[in-house]
Regions:
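Membrane-interface "cap" regions at the ends of multi-pass membrane proteins
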Residues: 33-34, 46-103, 270, 297-300
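Loop-to-transmembrane helix boundary motifs in multi-pass membrane proteins
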Residues: 160-161, 197-201, 307-316, 323-331, ...
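Flexible loop linkers connecting adjacent transmembrane helices
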Residues: 56-82, 105-109, 114, 130-159, ...
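Helix-loop-helix module between adjacent transmembrane segments
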Residues: 46-47, 94, 127-143, 147-212, ...
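Hydrophobic alpha-helical segments and their helix-loop junctions in multi-pass secondary transporters
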Residues: 175-201, 210-211, 230-258, 443-451, ...
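Extracellular/periplasmic helix-exit of transmembrane alpha-helices
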Residues: 136, 241-252, 299, 306-342, ...
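Extracellular loop-to-transmembrane helix junctions
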Residues: 37-55, 109-139, 148, 353, ...
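Hydrophobic, membrane-embedded alpha-helices of multi-pass small-molecule transporters
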Residues: 84-101, 238-246, 255-319, 358-367
Length: 508
């Protein structure tokens, strides 16, 4: 009787012994398979170490004050400024900055081979997470100031006005891009009467509601749930990468592009534009002020701003590795959404594929609504329109939504319209990071901090964006070495301008 009871107890999946046995077996499999993916495994570890070491160093450089009153209390209006739990802020920040970037961008970027690993790790730790942390913390110190105001304070009023227009355009493009994609996916997986137009209207209506209501009513309640599903999906894929033991390329094999059109898509600078959200994205600096207005303490900035970006980098690394496996097995013919669905269904079954599609649908929607919310706040600050009353919020929001709707109509009427919008969105996204990094550099000089931390990333991203303008087919499309010479000249010009400013500042 005792023997029978023990066997039945062992077979019960809820039994501790069974669970420990399952963990031991799978751990042994994972340990054995690690030899096939050393570069990938080391990259994940480096991202975590980057948060613990360089993130801590960045925090010490900024010197957050735990006793300082934050805008969540000093400007509490019950709409955009209010204290929220730290875990909620982290989840909202993560979902705001993620969107489809660390999934679709990483899948596209995987076509550049092991170079994608290097860019995600180095870019995320030293450029992207640093950019997100300092832009968020400067906003916090400036009373929750939005990005154009921060740029204006440190780069001048003319730059401020240009960046105000540029930022609103970028945010509207984010809203457009992140309406079209989820609507198209929902169109394919729902009944026929729920067509693309139907879902665009539904998503648009949600955008309007989420943009107008106080941040704790919609965003504060549902975003953490969506963030959990996105993280769960990534962890599931990560576990299956290790369990399946897929063979991934190593850096020791050399850095070579596996892009099907590698003749016209060089690793530099195309990859640095393609993989944005997993490494560095200017859009993030428009979102950090939203959460800076809800932080209870300056000390919480590192886990929220730096930590959310590191998590996004890990997610990008996971999807890049999964995509490399997919390209080796199936080739390059499918869309990014189809690749996500195939990988999750193959590795995680029906439940995994459902979670994946939820992530692919809801991640861009949640980035889109906060983008339009940011656009409303920037426009309201410029027009000096108080946003406490919903009627005033509606007055500012309607023109933004009207312009967004017109661009969506264009993207649907022209077969190539969406691709054009996406390419220019990608470049403008990274161009925004250039201005943000230069503003951070000036801030660090003025406040006697080690400004080289921001200066080197600022020069590099200037080089990336300017070279892309000259080399990309949708821009000037110049061949040979000329694009790189011109891009280098632009980067050198930025250094000379900065050096002259330093000289004048020292004289003052």
């Amino acid at each position: 009787m005792l023997k029978k009871y023990s066997v039945q107890k062992y077979k019960n999946p809820y039994n501790l012994c069974y669970c420990l046995h399952w963990i031991f077996i799978n751990f042994a499999i994972v340990k054995k398979n690690l030899k096939k993916m050393i570069t990938f495994s080391v990259s994940i570890i480096l991202l975590i170490v980057g948060y613990l070491v360089y993130g801590k160093f960045a925090e010490r450089v900024f010197k957050p004050d735990s006793n300082a009153a934050t805008p969540a209390y000093t400007k509490n209006d019950g709409v955009d400024y209010m204290p929220l739990p730290t875990w909620k802020i982290f989840m909202i920040q993560f979902l705001n900055i993620a969107g489809l970037g660390p999934i679709f961008g990483a899948i596209l970027g995987a076509q550049f081979g092991t170079a994608a690993y290097i860019w995600i790790v180095v870019g995320c730790i030293f450029i992207g997470a640093f950019h997100d942390y300092f832009s968020g913390m400067i906003s916090l110190r400036e009373g929750g100031a939005n990005l154009p105001d921060i740029i204006g304070k440190y780069l001048g009023n003319t730059t401020k006005q240009v960046m105000r227009v540029f930022t609103v355009i970028l945010l509207v493009l984010v809203g457009v891009v992140f309406v079209s994609q989820p609507a198209g996916i929902l169109d394919r997986i729902t009944p026929e009467w729920m067509n693309n137009t139907f879902w665009i209207i539904v998503i648009f209506a949600y955008y309007l509601i989420a943009t107008l209501l106080p941040i704790d009513k919609v965003i504060g309640k549902i975003y953490p749930l969506f963030a959990f599903s996105l993280i769960f999906m990534a962890l599931g894929v990560l576990f299956m990468i290790f369990k399946q033991g897929i063979s991934l390329p190593e850096i020791t094999d050399g850095i070579a592009s596996i892009h099907p059109q590698k003749e016209v898509t060089p690793i530099f600078p195309i990859m640095c534009i393609t993989i944005a959200c997993g490494a560095i994205s200017g859009f993030h600096a428009t979102q950090s002020p939203l959460m800076a207005r809800c932080l209870k303490n300056e000390k919480l900035g590192r886990p929220v701003f730096y930590g959310a970006m590191i998590l996004e980098g890990i997610m990008a690394m996971i999807w890049a590795a999964a995509a490399i496996w997919y390209y080796k097995e199936k080739g390059y013919g499918e869309t990014q959404a189809s690749i996500v669905y195939f990988i999750t269904e193959t590795w995680m079954g029906k439940v995994g594929s459902v979670l994946a599609m939820l992530g692919v649908v809801f991640a861009p929607i949640t980035s889109g609504d906060t983008a339009l919310r940011s656009a409303r706040l920037i426009l309201a600050d410029f027009l000096k329109i108080d946003q406490t009353k919903i009627s005033k919020r509606l007055m500012v929001s309607l023109p933004i939504f009207a312009i967004t709707a017109l661009i969506i109509v264009y993207s649907l009427s022209d077969a190539a319209g969406f691709n054009v919008i996406w390419r220019y969105f990608g470049w403008s996204n990274q161009a925004l990071s250039v201005f943000t990094l230069w503003a951070i550099t000036v801030y660090m000089v003025i406040n006697h901090k080690p400004w080289v931390m921001a200066f080197v990333p600022a020069v590099y991203m200037t080089l990336v964006c300017s070279t892309y303008l000259f080399v990309a087919p949708e821009c000037f499309g110049l061949g040979g070495s000329l694009p790189y010479i011109l891009g280098g000249a632009c980067a050198c010009a930025s250094i000379i301008i900065f050096a002259n400013w330093i000289k004048k500042d020292n004289q003052r």
